[in-house]
Every structure is written in structure tokens, then in C-alpha cells.
Amino acid sequence: MNMNIQNLMREAQKMQKNLQKTQEELEKTNYEGVSSLINITLNGNKDVVSVKIKVDDSFEKEDLEMLEDMILVAFKDAAKKVDADKEKKLGKYGQGLAGLM
């Protein structure tokens, strides 16, 4: 019985170390959201790293509202990519914990 608990503790520590490493990797990863003229880059914490707007001389002030909408779409696109990658990379740890309970 004692060996099983020790093995479980070792496995839990190993899983915790792997989880922490994966979380650190995700935080360092950049995700780019794109919407027509807008590119937004977020890190794994969903902090905005950069915003790039591609406009030319024909851009008019009336287009500002549309540009704001495109920024929002690009941000949401990048945020979805962060969530999907986190789910993909961290989901396996949640599945492993379910077997221990």
C-alpha cells in the first residue's frame, strides 16, 4: 500500500512539473489573429504583443468604425487560438488527473 502512494506521489510530481513546463511554453508562444487589414499578436496570457494595421493612401476617417470592428475580430481570432492551443496542450493533464480520483 505504501509503495502505491509513493508511486502516485512521484507520478503527481512528474505531472506537475510537465504541466508547469507546458504552461511556461504556452506563455512564451505568440498567436496571430487576422482580420482583413489588421494583424494582432497575443502571447499565451492573451496580452497584446503587437497590432499591425495595413492601410494605404485611400484610407479615410469614415472607415475608422470599420477598422475598429476589424481590430476586434482579429483580437478574438488570436484569443481563440490561445484557448485552443492551451486546451490541446493542457487537456492531457486534466485527463490524467481524472484517473487518480
Regions found by a protein language model. Name each.
Residues 1-30, 81-101:
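Long amphipathic alpha-helical segments used for membrane anchoring, targeting, substrate engagement
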Residues 12, 46, 71:
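Residue-level signature of catalytic and energy-coupling elements of molecular machines
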Residues 28-52, 59:
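N-terminal intrinsically disordered, cationic/polar leader segments
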Residues 53-54, 64:
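Short acidic, glycine/proline-rich loop/turn micro-motifs
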Residues 59-68:
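A short, polar/charged loop-to-alpha-helix boundary motif
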Residues 70, 74-85:
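Stable alpha-helical structural segments in soluble proteins, enriched in small hydrophobic residues
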